[in-house]
Amino acid sequence: EICIESNKRLIHFSTDCIFNGEKGNYDDGSLSNVIDMYGKSKYLGEVYGDKTLTLRTSLIGHELKSSYSLIDWFLNSNSTVNGYTKAIFSGLPTIEIAHFLYEHVLQSQLHGIYNLSAAPISKFDLLTLVNEVYKLNKTIVPKSDFVIDRSLDSHRLRSLTKYTPPDWNTLVVKMYLDYLSLGALLNER
C-alpha cells in the first residue's frame, strides 16, 4: 500500500535458503519447506504487489570489512580446503546482480516474486574456478559427505527480461575484476 500511495517501488531480496535443499531446481512457484529461523524469516519477508519486486537468489562476492562470505573465507583460508561436490547452488556475484538490476529492472515495471539464478554449480567447482581465476594455488579436497541442492530455476524471469546469465567462468572473472577495482578504490582512501 505504501508503495502504491507514494508511487514508489520496493525491490526486495530473498534467498534460496527458503528451501531445504533436498531436491534443487526450485521454481518461482515452489513453496518454502525450510525449518530454520533464517529461511523462515526470509520467506515471511517476501512481498508481492503491483509496486513490489522480490528476487530470490544467493549472493556471492566480497565484503568490505569482514571475511564471512564464501569467497573471502576462501581467500583467507589455509592452503588446503574442503570443496563439497554435492553442495549445489545457483547464485550470482554481486557485480552481476547490480548489472541485472541496472539493465533489466530499474526502468521496467516488473513486479512479483521471481528467482534470479545462474547455472547450478557445486561449491567444489566454484572454489576450483576461483582458485584458477584469482591464481591462488590452493588445494581443494573434493568431499561428497555434505549433500544440499538449493539451485533455483529462473526461466520465467529470464523469459520476461531476456536476461541470460553468463557462464561461471565469465562470472568469476567479472567478480575478480570488480575485486581488483574495489581494492584500488579502497587504497585511494
Named regions from a protein language model:
Residues 1-11:
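NAD(P)-cofactor binding segment of oxidoreductase domains
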Residues 9, 17-55, 59-64:
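Catalytic helix-loop patch of NAD(P)-dependent Rossmann-fold dehydrogenases
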Residues 14, 58, 117:
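Active-site beta-alpha turn of Rossmann-fold NAD(P)-dependent dehydrogenases/reductases
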Residues 35, 47-91, 95-96:
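NAD(P)-dependent short-chain dehydrogenase/reductase
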Residues 89-92, 121, 152, 163-166:
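Residue-level signal for the nucleotide or nucleotide-sugar donor/cofactor binding architecture
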Residues 95-103, 173:
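Amphipathic alpha-helical segments that line or abut small-molecule/effector binding pockets
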Residues 100-154, 183-184:
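Mid/C-terminal beta-alpha module of Rossmann-like enzyme folds, strongest
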Residues 167-189:
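Amphipathic terminal alpha-helices
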